[in-house]
């Protein structure tokens, strides 16, 4: 069971994540991204098995309140999982680029190809997932492993040594057929 601090980037999917995580027995506390990074770091230090989860949200990572600062200050110190905007923020924090995707997708199912490793172990390949995004990561640094793609688009990354990963898609959406299992396997990987 993980102690998850979920950074809410003011997105309606945040509470889908909360419900799914709590129904799996995880402890979840939620902080909005306008809270000072110092306050969030202090709260994380009080948790027994802390995981920082970065929610989806509108706009770009730079517009997401304290999220970029948290990523800079906490890299390598605790597991972090980013979803959609959170994934994009991870890519930028590690030196990658986030820009306009070739197509805008909101509420569309796509079949992604993955490497079958870590959080994707035992998952169907291709894996149907829900996509809601107009931005996509590119020019990734070598320390980020791309572990899922849709065509040439990066759909998931991980940093094994730092226990950091991100999903461009939404595992909490009903359109992601194995989303609950993927979140559980992700948390197990993050805390290993």
From Swiss-Prot:
It holds the Pfam family GATase. Keywords: Amino-acid biosynthesis, Aromatic amino acid biosynthesis, Glutamine amidotransferase, Lyase, Tryptophan biosynthesis. Disulfide bonds: none annotated. The active site is at residues 84, 170, 172. InterPro entries: Anth_synth/Amidotransfase, Class_I_gatase-like, GATASE, TrpG/PapA_dom. The keyword Amino-acid biosynthesis applies. Residues 3-192 form the Glutamine amidotransferase type-1 domain. It comes from the Bacteria. GO terms for biological process: L-tryptophan biosynthetic process; phenazine biosynthetic process. L-glutamine binds at residues 57-59, 88, 134-135. One of its GO terms (molecular function) is anthranilate synthase activity. Heterotetramer consisting of two non-identical subunits: a beta subunit (TrpG) and a large alpha subunit (TrpE). This is Anthranilate synthase component 2.
């Amino acid at each position: 069971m993980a102690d998850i601090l979920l950074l809410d980037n003011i997105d309606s999917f945040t509470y889908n994540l909360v419900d799914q995580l709590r129904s799996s027995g995880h402890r979840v506390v939620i902080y909005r991204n306008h809270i000072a990074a110092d306050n969030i770091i202090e709260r994380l230090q009080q948790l027994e098995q802390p995981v920082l989860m970065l929610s989806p949200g509108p706009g770009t990572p730079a517009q997401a309140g304290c999220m970029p600062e948290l990523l800079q200050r906490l890299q390598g110190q605790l597991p972090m999982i980013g979803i959609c905007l959170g994934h994009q923020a991870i890519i930028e924090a590690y030196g990658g680029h986030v820009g306009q995707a070739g197509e805008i997708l909101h509420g569309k199912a796509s079949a992604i190809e993955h490497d079958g490793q870590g959080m994707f172990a035992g998952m169907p390949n291709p894996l149907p997932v829900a996509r809601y995004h107009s931005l996509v990561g590119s020019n990734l640094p070598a320390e980020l492993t791309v572990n899922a793609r849709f065509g040439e688009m990066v759909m998931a990354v991980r940093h094994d040594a730092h226990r950091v990963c991100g999903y461009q898609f939404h595992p909490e959406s009903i359109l992601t057929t194995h989303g609950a299992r993927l979140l559980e396997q992700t948390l197990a990987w993050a805390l290993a």
